[in-house]
């Protein structure tokens, strides 16, 4: 009897969300994390931590990391890309020669490409044709998930059968993955809620009350739904984890970077100063 081939999943990006996702998936899949920084790679392999992004949180000891992007993606059954949208195209292009054909390429990035305003799945089509573009998104604060707290996410691929096949590999412990066929809506939910979260943060920074925050979130959701539908998504997608769920977490959590930006803007700081 031939041995059953174990699935291999590659994650590109050694930040908080890439590392967290890799640690979760490595519980029942061979998982290889790629990061540029050799110190982060060594720490993950030897100490099973990533202090720069996740503090003392313990990572799954089965997780392996490398600085060799070709080795990470070679023979992978799926590749998840967790790098900032500003570096998405460059990182994907650098992996292209070793990327298997026909596999899911899944964006974990919540942004648009500067200049072209392309979604990450559009960049996948542009740079790596012959693969299945998709997105994993939702209310996913990395530090909570790596600590083992319950969370849910949405997986949307252009091939829904491929999403259903991949779903069990991403489910682990209290991290539950649902599927959705609206790739555009799911992707835009993760992008547009950032704008509302900055506005909510500005309100919080100026001392606005809970009523103001609630108004910004609910009216922001209505605006997101209309814009998302105009751009090709489905309005109902924004009422789920990819829209409302993600927005609640981003607009209310002290861990939210976009809310933090809004708070600092309310103090009179410039956006360049905050980002630096």
PLM feature segments, named:
Residues 1-57, 62-67, 94:
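NAD(P)+-binding Rossmann beta1-loop-alpha1 motif at the extreme N-terminus of oxidoreductases
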Residues 9, 31, 131-133, 177:
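Hydrophobic anchor at the start of a short beta-strand
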Residues 59, 66-150, 166-168:
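Rossmann-like NAD(P)(H) cofactor-binding subdomain of soluble oxidoreductases
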Residues 87, 98, 123-131, 150-198, ...:
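Internal alpha-helical scaffold of NAD(P)-dependent oxidoreductase catalytic cores
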Residues 193, 200-204, 229-239, 243, ...:
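NAD(P)-dependent Rossmann-like dehydrogenase/reductase catalytic/cofactor-binding core
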């Amino acid at each position: 009897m031939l041995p059953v081939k174990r699935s291999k999943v590659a994650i590109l990006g050694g930040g908080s969300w890439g590392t967290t996702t890799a640690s979760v998936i490595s519980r029942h899949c061979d998982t290889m994390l790629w990061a540029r920084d050799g110190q982060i790679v060594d720490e993950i392999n030897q100490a099973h931590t990533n202090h720069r992004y996740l503090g003392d949180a313990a990572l799954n000891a089965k997780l392996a990391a490398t600085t060799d992007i070709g080795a990470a993606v070679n023979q992978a059954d799926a590749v998840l890309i967790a790098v900032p949208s500003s570096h998405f195209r460059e990182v994907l292009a650098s992996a292209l020669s070793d990327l298997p054909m026909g596999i899911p390429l899944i964006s974990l990035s919540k942004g648009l490409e500067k200049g072209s305003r392309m979604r990450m799945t559009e960049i996948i089509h542009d740079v790596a044709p012959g693969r299945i573009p998709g997105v994993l998104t939702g209310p996913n604060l990395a530090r909570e998930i790596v600590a083992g707290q319950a969370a849910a996410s949405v997986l949307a691929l252009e091939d829904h059968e491929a999403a259903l096949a991949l779903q069990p590999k991403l489910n682990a412990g209290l991290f539950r993955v649902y599927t959705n066929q609206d790739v555009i809506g799911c992707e835009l939910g993760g992008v547009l809620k950032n704008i509302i979260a900055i506005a909510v943060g500005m309100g919080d920074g100026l001392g606005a009350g809970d009523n103001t925050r609630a108004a910004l979130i609910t009216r922001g959701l209505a605006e997101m739904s209309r814009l998302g539908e105009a751009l090709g998504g489905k309005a109902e997608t924004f009422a789920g984890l990819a829209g409302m769920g993600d927005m609640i977490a981003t607009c209310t959590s002290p861990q939210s970077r976009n809310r933090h930006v809004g708070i600092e803007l309310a103090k009179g700081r410039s956006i360049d100063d905050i980002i630096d």
